[in-house]
Amino acid sequence: VYVNGKQVSQFDYLLKEDDLVEIKKENNLPLEILYEDQDFVVINKPSGLLSMSDGKEKEKTAYHYVSEYLKKQNKNQKVFIVHRLDRETSGVLMFCKNEKVRDLLQKDWNKIVYLRGYMALVEGKGLKKQGTLKNYLAESKTQQVYISNKEKGKLAITHYKVIKEMKNQTLLEINLDTGRKNQIRVQLSNINHPIVGDKKYGATSNPIRRLGLHAHAFGFVHPKTKKKYEFKTDCPKEFYGR
């Protein structure tokens, strides 16, 4: 309980006229809730946390923490995942509270979601100030995504803009037209600028001790109300170098 912005624990505390009383719920989640309403929960997922279970890890996932958080409010509340971020990617991740809205989103995902923005710290420098990467991507039996052709792969379109050049790295702002698995990681590796910390796709350095990819912006049109929602988070400070 807070009175005029200060926490109060005294059970017989006397209130005065015009005192502002606030009751704040404790939130011990290892992630930040950016927004919540009757249909959605939007979080800022930390790096290192799975979006949902991979069959091995069931409890320490964003899905698990959000589900437990909602069940404390309503034991019958369900949660549905509509998109994912890789374990080592941080940033904006959305969950649905009901199946109907989930289905509407998935049915017209590319029409409903109008903004998918990332910040990427890549190896090397010398990139054009801005550019567009277009490739066809396919996935091997070992879950390695690779550049393919039109017959075997799916089209992936990524736009980038140079934000800052450092001694051995470049910070990019990324916007997606498509949302293929590992899209940004594979396409940047293909132009010899892999994301730092991304050993899977050719990175040889890891100066920030994590994958240099952060989903900083996400925008969509509510499939029922047609209202626009847009969420943005700060780029991790370590991406800017010293």
Model-derived features: positions:
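Pseudouridine synthases involved in rRNA/tRNA modification
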Residues: E151-I157, K164-K167, L171, D177, ...
